[in-house]
Amino acid sequence: MARDQIDMTPLQSRDELVAWLAAGVKPVSEFRIGTEHEKTPFTLQGHQPVPYEGARGIGALLDGMKLLLGWEPIMERGNIIGLYDVTGGGAISLEPGGQFELSGAPVETVHQTQSELMAHLAQVREIAAPLGIGFLGLGMTPSWSRAQIPVMPKGRYKIMTNYMPKVGQYGLDMMYRTCTVQTNLDFSSEADMVKKLRVSVALQPIATALFANSPFTEGNANGFQSFRSEIWRDTDNARSGMIPWAFEEGMGFERWVDYALDVPMYFVKRGDAYIDVAGSSFRDFFDGKNSAFPNERPTLSDWANHLSTIFPEVRLKRYLEMRGADGVPWDRLPALPAFWVGLLYDDVSLDAAWDIAKHWNAQERQALRDDVPRFGFKARIRDRYLFEVAKECVTLAHAGLRRRARLDHFGRDETRHLEPLQRTIEAGRTPAEEMLEKFHGPWKGSVEPAYDEYAF
């Protein structure tokens, strides 16, 4: 989530950068689940984008949420740009085009994720409905051009907007037109981090297919099942992708630091101001060679903020962030944490998942990742269709959740949250393929019904 960190301690050594990541190590008893989801606001009348300004704008929506929740406002130059729950740790923030993001508090079970989600959606509806605002659960806006989409008043996004066209074809589409759901999970040691990172990077295309949900652009079928995932293939390859070096000997926190040091920066924040340093490396900044800050060393805040501008398919911070899934309607959202918790928080399933992926080489992993946005379940790796691998992974996740045996107050375990994925596997079609069937059938070639059927 794009919320800036504040720790102005100057950094003296590379070891401090490594230690910042290593501080994420925690005992298994303290493992938590974090879920972040984005949703696109639209006007209930006319299905248009919602501006920031005005009595029915996104700023007004955030003001209403502040009064309802009592959360701390996050302000920038007099504008409310988010909310933070000081006690629980959750937050609401804005993506560049007004996509409304809930960063959930760290919770112990997927049941709690679902409860938090339901409470959040009820609260959002209470404020949004009188303002005439609805929210869409797709991976990409289905009908609007980029030019139609408003720009949120956040300094970091202005810098990114200027920089993106220099480094890729689709960066502005990523910023302004896409939505995701992400799951954040813990690790118990450096070795545990490496194993979970490798498994989740290799299998991220499985999640992309299971959640593929962005087949429309500007009112037409775009030829992809997850155009959002395709967008990431040409956004900024210096900071995204399948990080093949993570599978090499010697992978650990230090290797991630070396990678991050050479990822081009976007900005440095000083006070309320964002200073544009786009394209310069953190390594030069660390060595006192940034022309905007001559002889000045970065702070821990600068490091934490820089790490939040790196976008591989799985991101390491003080936890691992699964980044491959499209945004989906509310009833499918808990299925993403359920999938990854079942695979990564159970040792038997984690070992079995690694057995699936450990013999794939970097070229095979990359080819699968490149094919999945267009072909979904019909993408292939070696002699297998991705559908077969996805079916196996959902089965492993189910078994992992069953062994976890975390029960809700009705005595049900977390496997029930996998039901949307099991239905997808039984149907043999991705969510995008189901939507395309509607588009070519009952929707009669219009995407407008999506604003009803896929709304929150």
Region roles according to the model:
Residues P27, T109-Q112, E116, N184-S188, ...:
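Conserved aromatic-histidine-acidic binding/catalytic patches
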Residues T40, E101, Q182-D186, E321-R323:
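Structured core elements
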Residues F42-L44, A105, D186-S188, A325, ...:
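Solvent-exposed residues in well-ordered beta-strands and their adjoining turns
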Residues L67, E126, A202-P205, A209, ...:
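Short, intrinsically disordered, mixed-charge
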Residues S280-E364:
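Long, well-ordered mid-to-C-terminal structural blocks that present hydrophobic/aromatic surfaces
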